[in-house]
Amino acid sequence: MRKILKIVSLLILLLLLVYSFFSPNSQLFVFVQLIIIAFLIGFGINCFVKKERYQGTLYFVIAICNITINLDKINELIQSI
């Protein structure tokens, strides 16, 4: 049941990401990116708890790459608040 819930929530996030990518509102895109980064960090911590270090490291690397790619947009969002 938990796996189905994770898959459904990730699919909803994917749809939100695609929608926000084509919408003129860039803040929505950054918010969705931050939510995805939070999920990736959570999955990475969960993998480290389960002693799956390779997958945990992979989640953290993907999250860090996502942060560095969108760093300018994140800074713009923080300054606009």
Swiss-Prot record:
Disulfide bonds: none annotated. It is found in: Cell membrane. It is a single-pass type I membrane protein. Residues 25-28 are extracellular. Keywords: Cell membrane, Membrane, Signal, Transmembrane, Transmembrane helix. The keyword Transmembrane applies. Residues 50-81 are cytoplasmic. GO terms for cellular component: plasma membrane. The keyword Membrane applies. Residues 1-24 form the signal peptide. The chain crosses the membrane at residues 29-49. This is Uncharacterized protein YosU. It comes from Bacillus subtilis (strain 168).
